[in-house]
C-alpha cells in the first residue's frame, strides 16, 4: 500500500522474502510465492531484473538459516547435538547484521544504476501476471497461489504479530515448542479477525500439512544420517580427510575455518544442501569431538558453529554454485513466471549480495577471531580450547626437559 519504485523494489523484495521465510521455514516456497509479485512489479517499474531476482533469492534463504521450523536448521542442529533454540540465539545478531548490511548494499546498487523513481504497488503487479505463469505457480507450489491472492486483497499489518511473538519468545529462551505454540495460537486468533482463517478445522489442516511437509523431510534426512553415518564410521571412510585437516590446522580456530570450507566443498560436490549437511556434518562433529580439548561449555560452542556452518554455508553457499539444485529450482520457477527474460545460473549468482555477505563474513569472522565483537557469536579462545596434538606436544617437551 505504501508503493515502491524501481530503486526500492529489489530491497523491498529482499526484506519481504527474508521475513516470510522465517515465518514459513522454507526458502523454496517463499521464492515461489514472491518471485511472480516482485518480478512483474519490477517489470512495471523498470527496475533491474537481475538485481531483483538475486535479492529475493538471497532473502528467501534467510529463514532456512535461522528459522525454528526450517528443516536445514533442525537437521544441522540435530547432527551436531545442539538445541535449535540455542543455535538460533547464538547466531541471531550475526544473521540480522548480514541482513542489514546486504539491504544497504542492494539499495546502494539500485541508486548507482540510476533507476527510475515512479511508484506502483503489488496489486497492479499481480494483475499483470499472465495466465501461463499462474498455471506454472500452481503446479510448482499450490500454496503460493493462495498467498498471492491474499497479498492482492491486502492483509492487515497486525498479522506480523505472530512472527514477532515467536522471535521474542525465542530470544527470551523459551522452549522451541512453546515458541511455535505461541505463533500458532496468535495466528489463529488474529487470522480470524483478518479474515485469512475460515474455520478452526481448516486452520488445523494448514498447520498439520505444514508440519508434515517439513517434518517428513527431516525424518528422512535423519534416517539417512543414522544409516550413512554408522556405515562410514565403521569403515573409517572419513579418516584420511580428517587427518589432512588436522595436519594443516595449527589451532582450533583454523580447524573451524577448514570445517567451514569443507561444508562448501561438500555442497559443491553433492549439489544439494541437505546431502551436504548429513554427509559433511558428521565429519565436522567428529573433528571437534575427538581432537579438541576444552570445557563442556566451550566444546558446545564449537558444535554450535559447526551447525551454523552446515546450514548457512549449505543454503547460502548453494547460491554461489551454478550447478546446485537450488539454482536449478530457481531458474525453473523464474522461466515459468517471467518468460520475458532468459535466466541463467550466473544471473542469480553475481547479484546475490546476501550470499556473498553471509558466506564471506562467516568464514572471515571465524578465521580472524573478530566474531568476538558480535554478541553470543564468538568462539572460545585459546588456551580455553586446544588441539589435542598440541597438548601432547607440550607434555612431551616437559618430559624431555625433566
Predicted feature descriptions by range:
Residues 1-8, 144-155, 160-227, 240-244, ...:
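Hydrophobic transmembrane alpha-helices of multi-pass solute/ion transporters
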Residues 1-8, 46-52, 113-153, 194-209, ...:
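Inter-helical loop and helix-membrane interface segments of multi-pass membrane transporters/permeases
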Residues 5-37, 245-287, 310-311:
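Hydrophobic alpha-helical transmembrane segments of multi-pass integral membrane proteins
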Residues 46-50, 75-88, 234-237, 249-251, ...:
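Juxtamembrane helix-boundary/capping and inter-helix hinge elements in multi-pass membrane proteins
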Residues 65-68, 77-143, 276, 317-402:
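Juxtamembrane and boundary regions of transmembrane helices in multi-pass small-molecule transporters
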Amino acid at each position: 500500500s505504501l508503493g515502491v519504485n524501481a530503486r526500492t523494489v529489489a530491497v523491498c523484495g529482499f526484506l519481504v522474502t527474508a521475513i516470510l521465510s522465517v515465518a514459513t521455514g522454507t526458502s523454496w516456497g517463499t521464492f515461489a510465492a514472491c518471485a511472480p509479485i516482485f518480478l512483474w512489479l519490477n517489470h512495471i517499474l523498470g527496475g533491474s531484473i537481475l538485481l531483483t531476482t538475486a535479492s529475493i533469492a538471497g532473502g528467501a534463504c534467510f529463514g532456512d538459516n535461522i528459522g525454528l521450523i526450517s528443516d536445514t536448521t533442525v537437521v544441522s542442529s540435530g547432527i551436531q547435538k545442539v538445541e535449535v533454540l540455542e543455535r538460533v540465539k547464538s547466531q541471531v545478531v550475526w544473521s540480522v547484521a548480514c541482513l542489514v548490511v546486504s539491504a544497504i548494499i542492494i539499495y546502494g546498487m539500485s541508486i548507482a544504476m540510476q533507476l527510475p523513481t515512479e511508484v506502483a504497488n503489488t496489486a497492479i503487479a499481480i494483475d499483470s501476471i499472465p495466465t501461463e505463469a499462474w498455471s506454472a505457480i500452481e503446479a510448482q507450489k499450490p500454496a503460493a497461489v493462495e498467498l498471492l491472492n491474499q497479498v492482492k486483497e491486502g492483509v492487515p499489518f497486525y498479522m506480523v504479530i505472530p512472527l514477532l511473538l515467536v522471535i521474542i519468545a525465542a530470544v527470551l529462551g523459551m522452549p522451541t515448542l512453546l515458541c511455535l505454540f505461541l505463533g500458532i495460537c496468535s495466528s489463529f486468533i488474529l487470522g480470524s479477525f483478518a479474515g485469512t482463517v475460515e474455520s478452526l478445522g481448516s486452520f488445523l489442516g494448514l498447520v498439520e500439512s505444514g508440519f508434515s511437509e517439513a517434518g517428513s523431510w527431516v525424518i528422512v534426512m535423519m534416517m539417512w544420517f543414522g544409516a550413512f553415518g554408522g556405515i562410514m564410521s565403521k569403515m573409517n571412510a572419513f579418516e584420511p580427510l580428517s587427518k589432512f585437516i588436522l595436519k594443516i590446522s595449527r589451532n582450533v580456530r583454523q580447524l573451524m575455518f577448514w570445517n567451514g570450507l569443507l561444508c562448501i566443498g561438500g555442497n559443491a560436490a553433492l549439489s544439494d544442501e541437505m546431502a551436504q549437511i548429513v554427509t559433511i556434518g558428521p565429519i565436522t562433529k567428529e573433528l571437534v569431538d575427538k581432537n579438541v580439548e576444552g570445557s563442556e561449555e566451550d566444546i558446545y560452542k564449537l558444535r554450535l558453529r559447526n551447525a551454523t556452518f552446515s546450514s548457512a554455508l549449505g543454503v547460502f553457499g548453494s547460491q554461489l554454485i551454478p550447478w546446485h539444485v537450488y539454482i536449478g529450482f530457481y531458474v525453473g520457477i523464474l522461466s515459468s513466471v517471467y518468460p520475458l527474460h532468459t535466466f541463467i545460473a550466473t544471473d542469480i549468482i553475481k547479484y546475490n549480495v546476501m550470499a556473498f555477505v553471509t558466506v564471506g563474513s562467516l568464514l572471515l569472522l571465524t578465521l580472524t577471531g573478530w566474531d568476538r565483537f558480535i554478541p553470543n557469536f564468538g568462539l572460545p579462545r585459546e588456551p580455553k580450547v586446544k588441539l589435542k596434538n598440541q597438548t601432547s606436544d607440550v607434555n612431551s617437551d616437559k618430559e624431555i626437559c625433566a
